[in-house]
Regions:
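Catalytic core of non-heme Fe(II) oxygenases with the double-stranded beta-helix
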Residues: 59-165
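Non-heme Fe(II)/2-oxoglutarate
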Residues: 1-75
Length: 165
């Protein structure tokens, strides 16, 4: 499988994106998640599920992200879904995911570009092959085994940088 890392803006209809943004503001986040086994940098995390039923049970509007992925990319199957988040001062590790393809959806519609918090994808020599700034209603995708990292959030930002993976 050879997938070029890409991002897509306006992934969902505007009103659905707004509902997802509001739904995620009500989530009870859990801190202390490792993206790298025994890593020192932790972040906020909530597991959603391993199948479509579990995703829908978690939140109807969040399931619409998977439904749109399925419509646009029918060749992929859901392995699991979860929420990640971090704030200023938390710097996630460069890491790889398991599975075939990773999709990351940015739900915060009020996010300002100067706050940072995007995602960078790297080649094996740690050169950036894609940097996608954080923008509400944007989704990025890349091969799951690709090195990638959520980017730091500016100290001027007092918001939680959230994403659906």
């Amino acid at each position: 499988m050879n997938i070029e890392p890409k991002y897509y803006d306006n992934f969902l209809e505007e009103h659905i994106a707004q509902l997802i943004d509001m739904e995620l503001r009500e989530v009870s986040w859990q801190y202390d998640y490792d993206s790298v086994k025994n890593g020192v940098n932790k972040h906020w995390h909530v597991f959603i599920g391993h199948d479509e039923g579990e995703i829908e049970d978690f939140g109807y509007h969040i399931s619409m992200v998977w439904n749109q992925i399925k419509n646009k990319f029918p060749e992929y199957k859901l392995e699991r879904a979860y929420l990640n988040a971090h704030t200023h001062g938390l710097e996630p590790h460069i890491h790889r995911d398991d599975g075939d393809v990773t999709f990351i959806y940015y739900p915060r519609m009020d996010w300002k570009p100067q706050w940072g918090g995007g995602t960078s994808v790297f080649d094996e020599n740690y050169n950036v092959t894609l940097h996608a700034g954080y923008k509400g209603n944007r989704i990025i995708n890349f091969e799951a085994h690709s090195l990638h990292q959520a980017q730091p959030v500016s100290r001027e930002c007092y918001q939680l940088r959230t994403c659906i993976v």
